[in-house]
């Protein structure tokens, strides 16, 4: 009887310790912590999640892929809900789903830098390659001060190995959390390093069950 009482008491102490240490609002990212990083709760909290309708994927400057090795999908700000337009400048994360636009012929558009891109409306996306699955992403909401932009852009880096471009396709996405504010950089290498940390942070958080359930929104 005495032994059983001690055993039960020990279980209660351990359970109490677990509950005291369990906080759904504590930061779950330790590995990639930087001074500028914001706390990421164990599950999305207000104002998240934010969800879009399907919006067009348009050409930007082409820097993400050509200069940084991190391709992005640009979306028009005027196609996004007000709650997303009102977000602070910075880096966010969530999930994205791309769909093709049927019945469109290939067309050529000119980027801001004067170069041309082919709009294929996603016709080369492959289900076999999981291109049309719900995928993790990081979102830059900002003016890209490193490049001296004076207007805000919305750029998604979808964390997936696409084999082809998909300008003209449509994307729907949710935003589940905020990684850090927008920063300026003295070197391109520092910018690339931070983006890669953002990507690893998003992958780590989005792989947890409380975040995985939000794939169902898309």
Swiss-Prot record:
Documented EC number(s): 2.7.1.26
InterPro entries named in the record: Riboflavin_kinase, Riboflavin_kinase_bac/euk, Riboflavin_kinase_dom_sf
Function (record text): Catalyzes the phosphorylation of riboflavin (vitamin B2) to form flavin mononucleotide (FMN) coenzyme.
UniProt feature coiled coil, ranges: none
Co-factor binding comment: Zinc or magnesium.
Pfam families, alphabetized: Flavokinase
Active site positions: 155 (nucleophile)
Further remark: FMN1 is essential for growth on rich medium.
Localization (cell): Microsome; Mitochondrion inner membrane; Endoplasmic reticulum
Signal peptide stretch: 1-19
Protein name as annotated: Riboflavin kinase
Any GO BP: FMN biosynthetic process
Known catalytic reactions: riboflavin + ATP = FMN + ADP + H(+)
Metabolic or biological pathway: Cofactor biosynthesis; FMN biosynthesis; FMN from riboflavin (ATP route): step 1/1
Presence of the UniProt keyword Cell cycle in the record: no
SMART domains per UniProt: Flavokinase (SM00904)
Sequence similarity: Belongs to the flavokinase family.
Known cofactor(s): Zn(2+); Mg(2+)
Gene Ontology CC: one annotated term: intracellular membrane-bounded organelle
A Gene Ontology molecular function term of the record: riboflavin kinase activity
Annotated positions binding Mg(2+): 72, 74
Keywords of the record: ATP-binding, Endoplasmic reticulum, Flavoprotein, FMN, Kinase, Magnesium, Membrane, Metal-binding, Microsome, Mitochondrion, Mitochondrion inner membrane, Nucleotide-binding, Signal, Transferase, Zinc
